[in-house]
Each structure stands twice: as C-alpha cells, then as structure tokens.
Design a protein with these regions (language model features):
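K/E-rich alpha-helical interaction surfaces of small helical-bundle regulatory domains
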Residues: 186, 190, 194-218, 240, ...
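Cleavable N-terminal export/targeting peptides
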Residues: 1-32, 254
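Hydrophobic, lipid-facing positions within transmembrane beta-strands of outer-membrane proteins
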Residues: 33, 39, 78-84, 96, ...
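Extracellular/periplasm-exposed beta-strand and loop segments of Gram-negative cell-envelope proteins
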Residues: 45-77, 104-133, 158-186, 214-244
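Transmembrane beta-barrel strands of outer-membrane/channel proteins
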Residues: 35-47, 98-104, 152-158, 207-211
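Outer-membrane beta-barrel "beta-signal"
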Residues: 40-42, 197, 239-254
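Residue-level signature of outer-membrane beta-barrel architecture
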Residues: 86-88, 102, 140-142, 195-197, ...
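Repeated loop/turn-to-beta-strand initiation elements of outer-membrane beta-barrel proteins
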Residues: 92-96, 147-150, 202-205
C-alpha cells in the first residue's frame, strides 16, 4: 500500500522519537531510575482541523484605493505526537498529571480567489500550514476502576504557523505579480478531555480531544504596481483555532 509523503514523515517521526524511550525502559540507566515510578511516556496519532477567521485589507493612498477580503479558511491534516508526563493518584479515585508534548502534522489549508471589475482583475492563491506544536498541560481527573481515567486537559501550546501564497493583478490600475511567505510562532491556550484505559500493568491506551486557541496571526507587506503606485497590505487571522482528535498508547514506569 502506498503512503503519501506527509504520512511517511509522521510515521518516521514517531518511530525515531519513540524507539529510544523503549530502550531506556528496558535498561538500567540513570535516566531510567530517575523516571520511576510515577512517570510515563507515549505517542499518539492525530487528526486535526484548523480554522482561520482571515481578513485582508489593502490600501493605496496615491489612488485613494481600499480593497478588503474576508475568508472563513480551513485546513486539515494527519499528525503524530510524543509526550512525557508525571502522574499521581490520591484519595483513591482522584488523579493529577503534568505532561509535556511535541507533535508534527501535515495540516494545510489552501484557498483560491478570483476578483474582477472595471478597474482590475486579481487572482489570489494562499496556503496556511501548521506543522509543529509543543507545550505543557495539566491533567486533573478521576479514576474509575472498572472503566479507566476520565480527565480534563488545561495547557499552553506553541504552534508554528506559516502563511504563503501569490497574488497577480492586471487592469487599468496597474499590474503586478508576486509571492509572499511568513512563518510565526504563536502561543495559545489548550483545553481538552480524554479517557485512558488500562491494557496491562504498564500499558494504557488513550482517546483525547483538544481545542487550541492561538494568538492573532498578522502579516504586513508593501509593494508597487507597474504604474509605480504603492500598496500596503495587512493580512490577519483572528485567533486561529486548532482542533485535534488523538488516539494514543503510553507506557508507565512501575
């Protein structure tokens, strides 16, 4: 069966990231003893969806010109995550965990827009990508012996967001053609909920849903057309949202 490049990259990422941890778990190393007995590590596969409330404003003072667009922009992809955490059970049924995570995704959203009037014709192509995320989260929960651990998730995430594309204009106003690209690291809050089921003494499986809300993505640029008119363009995605559905497996040091 053929796997596309993004899926192959994610599988390789999980393999090379996760394998050293299995080796550490099996050998008596200083790090191995440091991790016992309340730590765990694991990996998840991810299906994620991004939402961008995107606006583009363009002005030219020389032409007394203003143009704007508003798109409900979406992206989706597959990803992989590795995580390392520390947990404690108290008062029999209560649970608290602290977890660091790092994930890689093929998430991408493309858009094509054509605008034409008596003054100009424009073609706009663009792509939003979110490839890397990392962060720290707290897991408060409750343990039900016959079911598993129900937990919430509150954390902080950093996401690598890229906007790239091209714009081409022709008409009496003047013509121009160019590309743009900008990458920013955006912080945000992460909220989620999940369920962990015990498979063996050391192994658990996990199902989780996370909702991430990021800082505004703002990208300003300037350019000139063939008539030497200057244009100022502001692109903004208001608080991008990244939803993640995760299915994972983890190992407990016990």
């Amino acid at each position: 069966m053929y796997l596309g490049f993004p899926v192959q990259s994610i599988l390789l990422f999980l393999l090379f990231s996760f394998t050293p941890l299995f080796v550490l778990a099996a050998e008596k190393t200083p790090l191995n003893f440091f991790l016992r007995p309340d730590t765990y590590f694991g990996f998840s596969v991810i299906r994620d969806t991004a939402h961008y409330n995107f606006k583009r404003d363009e002005t030219s003072q020389e032409l007394n010109f203003t143009d704007f667009d508003h798109f409900d922009w979406h992206g989706s992809g597959l990803g992989g995550e590795i995580y390392l955490g520390y947990e404690k059970f108290f008062r029999t049924h209560y649970y608290i965990g602290l977890e660091g995570f790092f994930n890689r995704s093929s998430n991408e959203g493309k858009i094509y827009f054509f605008d034409s009037n008596e003054l100009y014709s424009r073609i706009l192509k663009g792509s939003f990508k979110q490839k890397w995320q990392s962060g720290l989260a707290i897991h408060p929960g409750i343990y039900l012996p016959s079911v598993g651990i129900f937990y919430g998730r509150v954390g902080w995430i950093v996401s690598d967001v890229n906007l790239s594309g091209s714009i081409t204009q022709s008409g009496p106003f003047g013509s121009f053609s160019g590309r743009f690209s900008n990458t920013k690291k955006k912080n945000g809050v992460q909220l989620g909920t999940g369920l962990e089921l015990e498979l063996t003494k050391n192994w658990r499986c996990r199902v989780e849903w996370d909702w991430n809300r990021l800082q505004d993505f703002i990208f300003d640029s300037q350019g000139r057309d063939s008539n030497n008119h200057r244009y100022q363009t502001t692109r903004i995605a208001k608080h991008p949202i990244l939803e993640q559905f995760k299915l994972g497996l983890n190992w407990r040091f016990a």
